[in-house]
């Protein structure tokens, strides 16, 4: 596999050096793009919410996504133009539903290969299990611990992961190729792949050990002269970083977030930016460039149309729109159905195991204070699992909660439902913090202003925060309480978090630097399963543990 890949790169380089006749007229190119697929081989529960075309004040839920429907949508769009390419902006794997995660996301890699994906940026979730595992997914081979669990030996990705800004700290070389070049009627187009530079702060340290994540702008701008020296003028960036728009899925009013500043600083030679990470949908013009994002889980495909100049080889025109991968409009792709069915049969004994019931769905929608019903459940489960280690309260990062918990129509909850909520296999860790240290940790919830991360808290613990105060001063002094009693700043507390938070993930550095006497416990999903089994039926409670003051 490595030899074939190396030969392919050499051949591509040789072809770039050949004199290929330029076309007589402009060349139309169609780029199809997705992002943040996260192993959603089956349509995600909840589909996608869009503005009601009949009433702008309302929204509609459209059943969308899933590999079977995505493959059909891509095939239909691809048929419109023989000059096409299918690409992605990262997080194709990681935080995946059970049918993919149980097999280390090999099913997703195979499914995307069947769709004809050609290149993708590496996202932060591609590092959930470390760079060695990412390279295995690229090159193929059995998992080092679990072996080959799938219906056939795993051959690796047929598409190319790109990592221009991810560098081996020892060698200084990129972990994976920095870009991919494809010719359309003789005109080369470069696709540069970027991982967000904040990846070390949102992935467990073991996942990024030995790697450097360099500045996105500096990386791209340094590559531009080399690409242009090769005769490449059309440049597309695939970046796993994004923004927060305020409009509908095909609009871009008032976009904010890191992508804006990044795109504004790119070399003018960059023509199109395909983004992701924020799980939002938009089609924008930023600093004169086309910028797209296609929501998440394969619910949308960005359809990007370029017109290449036959003389300069540069992009003359660029336009785009986001297409909903509607489960009503598109038929299931037969090859995807067969692939998924193979893995579903293997996963069924575990996936369909009944673990409990819900009296009503527990949503991950946030209250004004930042609480969620499913977050409360998980925090309570983690506290219950660690009381024997002296735990007095538990805190859960919202990014580790990937879905609401609804069960089936009768409220029956199966293991696959729990896994959809907590797919990371994090151990629980109980540490000692003083009241003052706990307050400092809570202040770190607002360090990342565009994306505050309000920790979910267990029953019996609560506090107030003031939205009018600046970050670092938002927790109301004296408001921290445990079972109704005020927490003294010097009071030692046993606090349970998951291993990701214990290592300082999401910039919660207090847990890593100041937590004492760590004790490792169950896996998070095991704690949740035990909690559900012990209670039989759970119901959403009042979202009143955290109080927001405006």
Named regions from a protein language model:
Residues 489-533:
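A hydrophobic, small-residue-rich beta->alpha segment in the mid-to-C-terminal subdomain
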Residues 322-324, 358-364, 394-404, 457-466, ...:
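A glycine-rich phosphate-binding loop feature that marks nucleotide/adenosyl-phosphate handling sites
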Residues 404-445, 504, 508:
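Flexible, polar/acidic helix-loop-strand segments at domain edges
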Residues 18-330, 335, 342-345, 369, ...:
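Acidic, metal/ion-coordinating pockets
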Residues 353-371:
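Glycine-rich phosphate/diphosphate-binding loops and the adjacent beta-loop-alpha structural elements
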Residues 1-4:
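Positively charged n-region of N-terminal signal peptides that target proteins for export
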Residues 6-15:
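Bacterial N-terminal signal peptides
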Residues 203, 303-304, 330-332, 406-408, ...:
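Short conserved micro-motifs at the rims of enzyme active sites and ligand-binding pockets
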């Amino acid at each position: 596999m490595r030899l074939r890949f190396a030969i392919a790169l050499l051949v591509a380089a040789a072809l770039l050096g050949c004199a290929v006749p330029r076309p007589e007229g402009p060349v139309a190119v169609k780029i199809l793009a997705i992002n943040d697929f996260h192993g959603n081989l089956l349509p995600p529960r909840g589909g996608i919410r869009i503005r009601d075309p009949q009433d702008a004040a309302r929204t509609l839920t459209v059943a969308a996504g899933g590999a079977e429907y995505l493959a059909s949508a891509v095939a239909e769009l691809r048929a419109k133009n023989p000059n096409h390419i299918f690409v992605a902006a990262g997080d194709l794997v990681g935080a995946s539903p059970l049918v993919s995660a149980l097999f280390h996301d090999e099913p997703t890699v195979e499914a995307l290969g069947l769709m004809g994906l050609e290149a993708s940026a590496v996202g932060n979730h591609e590092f959930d299990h470390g760079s060695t595992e990412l390279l295995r997914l690229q090159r193929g081979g059995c998992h080092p611990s679990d072996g080959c669990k799938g219906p056939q030996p795993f051959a690796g990705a047929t598409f190319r992961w790109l990592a221009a800004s991810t560098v081996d700290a020892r060698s200084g070389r990129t972990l994976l190729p920095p870009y991919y070049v494809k010719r359309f009627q003789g005109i080369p187009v470069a696709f540069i792949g970027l991982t967000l530079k904040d990846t070390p702060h949102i992935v467990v340290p073991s996942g990024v050990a030995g790697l450097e994540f360099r500045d996105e702008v500096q990386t791209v701008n340094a590559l531009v002269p080399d690409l242009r020296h090769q005769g490449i003028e059309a440049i597309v960036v695939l970046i796993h970083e994004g923004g927060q728009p305020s409009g509908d899925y095909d609009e871009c009013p008032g976009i904010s977030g890191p992508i804006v500043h990044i795109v504004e600083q790119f070399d003018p030679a960059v023509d199109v930016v395909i983004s992701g990470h924020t799980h939002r949908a938009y089609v924008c013009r930023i600093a004169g460039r086309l910028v797209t994002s296609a929501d998440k889980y394969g619910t949308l495909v960005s359809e990007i149309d370029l017109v290449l100049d036959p003389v300069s080889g540069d992009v003359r025109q660029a336009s785009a729109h986001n297409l909903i991968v509607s489960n009503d409009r598109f038929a299931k792709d037969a090859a995807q159905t067969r692939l998924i069915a193979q893995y579903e049969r293997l996963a069924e004994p575990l996936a369909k195991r009944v673990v409990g019931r819900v009296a009503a769905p527990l949503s991950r929608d946030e209250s004004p204070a930042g609480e969620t019903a499913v977050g409360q459940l998980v925090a309570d489960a983690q506290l219950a699992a660690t009381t024997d280690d002296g735990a007095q309260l538990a805190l859960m990062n919202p990014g580790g909660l990937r879905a609401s918990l609804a069960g089936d129509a009768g409220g029956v909850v199966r293991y696959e439902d729990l896994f959809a909520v907590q797919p990371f296999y994090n151990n629980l860790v109980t540490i000692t913090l003083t009241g003052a240290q706990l307050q400092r940790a809570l202040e770190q919830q607002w360090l990342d202003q565009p994306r505050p991360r309000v920790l979910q808290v267990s029953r019996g613990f609560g506090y107030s925060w003031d939205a009018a105060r600046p970050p670092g001063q938002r927790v109301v002094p004296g408001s921290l309480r445990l079972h109704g009693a005020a927490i003294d700043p010097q009071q030692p507390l046993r606090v349970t978090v998951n291993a990701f938070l214990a290592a300082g993930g999401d910039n919660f550095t207090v847990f890593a630097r100041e937590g004492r006497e760590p004790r490792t416990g169950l896996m998070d999903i095991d704690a949740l399963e035990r909690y559900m089994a012990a209670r039989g039926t759970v119901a959403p409670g009042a979202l009143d543990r955290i109080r927001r003051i405006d």
